[in-house]
Amino acid sequence: MTALNAVEKGAAAVGAHLVRDVSLPALVLHREALEHNIRWMQDFVSNSGAELAPHGKTSMMPALFQRQIEAGAWGITLANAVQTRAAYAGGVRRVLMANQLVGAPNMALIADLLADKDFDFHCMVDHPDNVADLGLFFAARGLRLNVMIEYGVVGGRCGCRSEQEVRELAKAIKAQPALALTGIEGYEGVIHGEHAISGIRDFAASLVRLAVDLQNNGSFDLPKPIITASGSAWYDLIAESFEEQNAAGRFLSVLRPGSYVAHDHGIYKEAQCCVLDRRSDLNEGLRPALEVWAHVQSMPEPGFAVIALGKRDVAYDAGLPVPLKRYRAGIVPAEGDDVTACIVTAVMDQHAFMTVAPGVELRIGDIISFGTSHPCLTFDKWQVGCLVDEQLQVIESLHTCF
């Protein structure tokens, strides 16, 4: 008997059709919406006088990184040394690592990349101990590491908690010949509550104020230091605040949203609606490009269907999958029927429980397309996704590097 190789979940050959040829479940990206989102965010950031370094942790698809860079992105944001190595292998040559570089093995991964003089890398620091460790490690290798001070908020995530801590850390960096202070960074996504909008504006203004203070004190090692913030929900407020503070006049302003590339049918759809409410000049927003497709597996009771889709396939931390359309398996051209009135009520490891709306007729083997909420935690469940055209034909396989 001929040996058979393992098959990767959701893998498909170029030219395959989603409803006829692809083993499901599958991660699906719609080309038209994806390209729209890449253009939309690049235009928004450029028109705001800033640069874009999209957070690659969302998809960890180097092929998407290249599309974003070709559209004008300044660089790619990443979360750790392993992600940085994957992006470098995929052709990325400028990285903001929006995290602290901790641990000698992780430092070694970055040191290897810094042997390439064309590789521009910046990581965050928020504590003198980390500064000392980095200074010692990179000095021993004859390398100089670009670091940025992270400024945070009380009760938030990482980052110095006071302006005085920032100033003291800048002095500690100055004392390390192997380190270069290239900017200041913050993350506003941890600011919540009734006064979140004003709190985010104040936080962005404080970043600029601190950057000006450090620049006036000669702390930076770049003539035009970097100032950066912005996740995927409040990027408009950060852009607006940086503009109001004239940050672009003295600094390289960099925004770092990531989820926009795929968007979603959940939390980022809601966040985008808020952006459009705040910005009446934006007459069109982002489009959901990401779906997960799966078969109806069982219909053991009236009005109840079990879908061959579970926690191994789709995010469930910020809302359950949203049924979108029903397709008859094998029928091409595929005309999907609206099933948005159906509701997923629970997910298990490999199963989703779906209440079937009155008037919706399903049969075993039917294909349901699902929207998701929080794309970062859907992408990481896949090693390959299907990029499809408007006819639902696979035009490219996109590989992840988680």
Regions found by a protein language model. Give the residues of each.
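A charged N-terminal "starter" segment
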Residues: 1-112, 387, 398-402
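Conserved, mostly hydrophobic/aromatic
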Residues: 34, 57, 87, 149, ...
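Internal helical hairpin/lid segments
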Residues: 259-331
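C-terminal accessory subdomain/extension
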Residues: 301-402
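Glycine-rich tight-turn/loop motif centered on a GG-T
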Residues: 19-30, 93-97, 111-122, 194-201, ...
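Active-site-proximal beta-alpha core segment in soluble small-molecule metabolic enzymes
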Residues: 55-194
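Active-site loop/helix belt of alpha/beta enzymes
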Residues: 152-280
